[in-house]
């Protein structure tokens, strides 16, 4: 069997939905975590520079920002690991379905992988046999866990609900920055509003970013317009938008994972039909 035919047979059983969802998950998490981390840093600098001169006013905010940044590190690590596990589950379940119902045949690729895991031909040294045995045990344990798609359905469902809340929360800073940017546009083009320029303000206290006793806590008029024109404000605003898009992409990937895992579970346990997920 040629290499091309071998690859073609392997692709027949590839879980394409899981492959797409994994790529989307990695992209979304990287975008959300990377841009979100830098956007929080930019917000901290903007608050320190323009909205409050007293460190005690924004000390709690800085602690919250730093805590969120540490959570971002953990989120990135978890999702990259869990995405890889879900992809492995997709391959495992697809192979199981096709083996059970005769749609998936063992190829030279599978035989070669099996030989690699089990140590190959005789004549290997004891060190090579020990390494192969250890790898075989790891694969066996992983295979036993991957053999329960219902677990992945439950975990992914719970994770999707949690991430839905994260997605909603990621829209809050976008809303705040958009309101500030809209106010700046009204200041830049006074003909669009009947209010005086001096009364148009961005109040960080109104959104709970700063306590009500913070001074000045808000910026108005031409001072606010000058802030909106800074590269720091523009960059932070766009970073929050990118983080929001990343959260949306991650949510879509989780929904795709959940649908694929649920469908595979139903096929294996109830329907008895093959699937390409």
Curated annotation (Swiss-Prot):
Residue ranges in the Cytoplasmic topological domain are 2-9, 89-151, 261-277
Q: What is this protein called?
A: Myelin proteolipid protein
- Looking at the keywords, is Phosphoprotein present? yes
Linked pathology is:
Leukodystrophy, hypomyelinating, 1: An X-linked recessive disorder of the central nervous system in which myelin is not formed properly. Clinically characterized by nystagmus, spastic quadriplegia, ataxia, and developmental delay. Spastic paraplegia 2, X-linked: A form of spastic paraplegia, a neurodegenerative disorder characterized by a slow, gradual, progressive weakness and spasticity of the lower limbs. Rate of progression and the severity of symptoms are quite variable. Initial symptoms may include difficulty with balance, weakness and stiffness in the legs, muscle spasms, and dragging the toes when walking. In some forms of the disorder, bladder symptoms (such as incontinence) may appear, or the weakness and stiffness may spread to other parts of the body. SPG2 is characterized by spastic gait and hyperreflexia.
Q: What does this protein do?
A: This is the major myelin protein from the central nervous system. It plays an important role in the formation or maintenance of the multilamellar structure of myelin.
Sites of S-palmitoyl cysteine lipid attachment are 6-7, 10, 109, 139, 141
Quaternary arrangement and interactors, per the entry? Answer: Interacts with MAL.
Residue positions, PTM Phosphoserine = 114
Residue ranges crossing the lipid bilayer per the database entry: 10-36, 64-88, 152-177, 234-260
Recorded source organism is Homo sapiens (Human)
Protein encoded by which gene: PLP1
Q: Which Pfam families does this entry report, sorted A to Z?
A: Myelin_PLP (PF01275)
Subcellular locations according to the entry: Cell membrane; Myelin membrane
GO CC terms, sorted: myelin sheath; plasma membrane; synapse
Q: Which UniProt keywords apply?
A: Cell membrane, Disease variant, Disulfide bond, Hereditary spastic paraplegia, Leukodystrophy, Lipoprotein, Membrane, Neurodegeneration, Palmitate, Phosphoprotein, Transmembrane, Transmembrane helix
What Gene Ontology terms describe what this protein does at the molecular function level? identical protein binding; structural constituent of myelin sheath; structural molecule activity
Q: How does it sit in the membrane?
A: Multi-pass membrane protein
Disulfide linkages recorded for this protein, renumbered to the chain, are 184-228, 201-220
What does the record list as GO biological process? astrocyte development; axon development; axon ensheathment; central nervous system myelination; chemical synaptic transmission; inflammatory response; long-chain fatty acid biosynthetic process; positive regulation of gene expression
Is Mitochondrion among the key words of this record?
A: no
Where is this chain lipid-modified, annotation O-palmitoyl serine?
199
Q: Which residues carry this modification: Phosphothreonine?
A: 116, 118
Please report which protein family the annotation says this sequence is part of: Belongs to the myelin proteolipid protein family.
Q: Which residues lie on this side of the membrane: Extracellular?
A: 37-63, 178-233
């Amino acid at each position: 069997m040629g290499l091309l035919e071998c690859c073609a047979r392997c692709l027949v059983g590839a879980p394409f939905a899981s492959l797409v969802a994994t790529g989307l998950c990695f992209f979304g998490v990287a975008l959300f975590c990377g841009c979100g981390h830098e956007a929080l840093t930019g917000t901290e600098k903007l608050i320190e520079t323009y909205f409050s001169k007293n460190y005690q006013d924004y000390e709690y905010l800085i602690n919250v920002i730093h805590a969120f940044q540490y959570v971002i590190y953990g989120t990135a690590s978890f999702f990259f690991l869990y995405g890889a596990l879900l992809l492995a589950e997709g391959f495992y379940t697809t192979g199981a379905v096709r083996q059970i119902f005769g749609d998936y045949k063992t190829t030279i690729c599978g035989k070669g992988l099996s030989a690699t895991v089990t140590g190959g031909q005789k004549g290997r040294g004891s060190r090579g046999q020990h390494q192969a045995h250890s790898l075989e045990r790891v694969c066996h344990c992983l295979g036993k866990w991957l053999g329960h798609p219902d677990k992945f359905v439950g975990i992914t469902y719970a994770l999707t609900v949690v991430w839905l809340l994260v997605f909603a929360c990621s829209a809050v800073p976008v809303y705040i920055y958009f309101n500030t940017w809209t106010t700046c546009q009204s200041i830049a083009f006074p003909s669009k509003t009947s209010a005086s320029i001096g009364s148009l303000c961005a109040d960080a206290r109104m959104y709970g970013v700063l306590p009500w006793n913070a001074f000045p806590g808000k910026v108005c008029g031409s001072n606010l317009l000058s802030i909106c024109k800074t590269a720091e404000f523009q960059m932070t605003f766009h970073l929050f938008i990118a983080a929001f898009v990343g959260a949306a992409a991650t949510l879509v990937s989780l929904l795709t994972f959940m649908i694929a895992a649920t469908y595979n579970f139903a096929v294996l346990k109830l329907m008895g039909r093959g699937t390409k997920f």
